[in-house]
Amino acid sequence: TDARLSRLRGNDFDGKDAAGLILDNKLTELYFNYGRYLMISGSRPGSQPLNLQGIWNQDMWPAWGSRFTVNINTEMNYWCAESCNLSECHLPLFDLIRRMRPNGEQTARDMYHCGGFVCHHNTDLWGDCAPQDRWMPATIWPMGAAWLCLHIFEHYQYTLDRDFLAQQFDTLCGAAQFFTEYMFENSAGQLVTGPSVSPENTYLTESGAKGSLCIGPSMDSQIITLLFTDVLEAARIL
């Protein structure tokens, strides 16, 4: 495998035709199946969801606490769950969202004086939803619960499990309710979030200063649009 990876990267051609060595569809297939194996072995009903470093990592104190980083990492872990016919491996994520909800409701009340529930860019086994760390490109971002909740309707779309959707409907509505109270109208008459960030991105101002906080990042609007769409469609189905 090491030799195949080296050839794929173009590091070692062994004097042979480069194109023939780089094209290794079987290695791509192997990596795809390895990803399925990691999900099957690491995310079973009744267990915890896939975390940041994986349950098989070698460190006693893994990087970033091996928590659930929900500004893309946790979601990305589950992007293939339904399309790869591993719906049952998706279930631990919904258990985590259930644990997050009461904490997220308290965070919404205490921090924003809003109803519903909210989570920022990290959570853990106990479903902590408050902002974590002090790194501006990530910390002040209230979209974690909303993005995770998009997985609820995706699971329904693949399984057509109405009982599951009915059980999760209040959670979907709670994530959406927060934004009906949190968003505000900008000078152009648009409903926007803010302050928020484009997760782990920065920008340069006209004066050349580096910034991270902004009003109405596109990612927030996209997640909220999908979340509201899911709530409306779920209500129609139920």
Give the location of each predicted region.
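Acidic/polar, glycine-enriched structural segments that form the non-catalytic walls/loops
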Residues: 1-68, 87-107, 235
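Active-site lining segments of carbohydrate-active enzymes
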Residues: 9, 15-22, 79, 85-143, ...
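Alpha-helix C-terminal capping/termination sites
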Residues: 21, 28, 40-41, 77, ...
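Soluble non-cytosolic domains of exported or imported proteins
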Residues: 22-29, 71, 162, 218, ...
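Hydrophobic core segments within long, regular secondary-structure runs in both alpha-
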Residues: 29-36, 74, 90-101, 105, ...
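Sec-exported extracytoplasmic/periplasmic mature domains
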Residues: 36-43, 82, 98, 102, ...
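The feature captures the catalytic groove of carbohydrate-active enzymes
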Residues: 51-66, 115-165, 180-238
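Conserved catalytic neighborhood of penicillin-recognizing serine enzymes
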Residues: 63-83, 87, 212, 219
